[in-house]
Amino acid sequence: EGTGLKIFNANAATLLRSMEMGCAGYSGVMANFHPDLYVWLCKNYKEQPEKAQELMNFLGAASMVECQVYPVNSKYHMNLVGVPMTLQSRRQDYKLLTGSKKLEIEEFCAITETFRKSFFGK
């Protein structure tokens, strides 16, 4: 306190709890998958705590996709949502994103959209 220093959490599963304890926001890789959900949480968790917890339940479970073949899976996801890019990465061999892992990302994309519609009422 008393400085301009702000702490941002990069762990999606602990985000809500850390913001309740004073963290300034989120700066994690899962924002590559659904940034709008993190924006909503950071802006609204104080005024709508029950809804924030509902969202956090989804985000915490969704964060497990990070353990798959990140960042290749994120690049694949970006292609699915209309942002074209190669799957090549310095960190992971894109060949590790097998057909079944691609299917998991496709299903993850679909369930995220289902959650988004339910959560925002669209």
Mark where each language-model region is.
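Catalytic alpha/beta core domains of metabolic enzymes, predominantly
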Residues: 1-70
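C-terminal extensions of enzymes
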Residues: 69-122
